[in-house]
Amino acid sequence: LPIVITDMRNPEKTTTIERKPNNDNGHPIKIITGKKNCAILRIEDEFVHKLLESLENKKRYSEFVILSPFTKDGIKFSRILFLDGDYIKRNEKYVLGFDPLATITYNRGVITLIGDEMWRVQQIVSKTSAKIGESGLNILNIDAQEETSRIIVVVEDTGNNIEKAISAIHEERSNIKFI
């Protein structure tokens, strides 16, 4: 999306700034991070907006990622990944108070891949998830978003699972390329 700057005194003079991605600008995966001690909240979709608004405005807490929703027995649920499991434990009663069907799963670890235009990378999710699986880990959730060029992989946070997953992705990194 180009940015056009116009001279207010002489509108005929303009400057256009436009990003032109270079296909040869290095590897598409720029950063691989790991975070231990996370939690996932499952909450009915109708209550999630009030909870998130309350967390952000009243509690001033925003260290969470909204994961893909699911439907079970005709009820639509949202899933929220909290990056600080201890915070959720301390505020569990408050968080669960928004929905009687809400549940929290602790001991989750998150691996995040951040890059440039990863949507152009063929099989990036399948290659990284296969390599994580080959290292003996069970992937509990994967969330990939074209708009953010971010991939989130959730695994159980036990032992050295996070380190193993990061190492596995680094091993596969050389096989991941732009199309």
List each model region and its residues:
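C-terminal catalytic "cap/lid" subdomain
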Residues: 1-179
